[in-house]
Amino acid sequence: MLNSSLPFYSTLKLLLDGSYTNTVFRDDAAQLEENSRDLLHRTSQINSTSSYLVRSLQPLVTDPSSVLTNLYYPEIDPATSNYRAHLRRETDDFSPGFGGLFTLQFDDVHLASVFFNALNVHKGPSLGASVTLCQPYVQTVFHKQKEWAGQCGLHESIVRVSVGLEDRRALFSAFRVALAEADQAKAARITDGLEEWKDGSESGSGSSRLTDNDSLTDVRFEK
């Protein structure tokens, strides 16, 4: 689909006309038309809900007790001005925004797994659905290329969220519950580490058995 108001419309249309074949079936076209009737309203709602969730979760990134270490979304990105320059124009039936996709990054894979399993939303690799979807992105997309993905800045401990049309306060409540589960897992691990350090000191070992590499690389997200 080409936007006739864009400067390269005529050039692109000429190129596409030379290779275009109409392969749209009648029932597909009917479904597309039905889905398009409230597209702008749905998109506006998803934009608004996503912004609300990101803004609500953002303070946790700087909280040392939180399992959340980073949050990725164009609205809060250092390069947000580049995105704002290309936002769709506001109209009576549409409020521009930054889309329904954002990414959470956690301390490590285990804590990301605890959050993922506790988050009461649909789980899946798609995006743009009418229901909120959650996906352990690197675990599913780059399962056999994790080292390469890490070199490109994609950490194993990220969870991608595609926001749907649910009530935004209900969604935020679900995120709070899941984050609380992960925070408890983090606190329990710290407590266990202190106990092990204490036991080790008393037995003369002089060091804790809990290390940064303590089996976390073996943790996998549950299916």
Predicted regions and their residues:
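Active-site C-terminal subdomain of aminotransferase-like
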Residues: 1-101, 105-139
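PLP-dependent enzyme catalytic core of the Aspartate aminotransferase-like
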Residues: 133-223
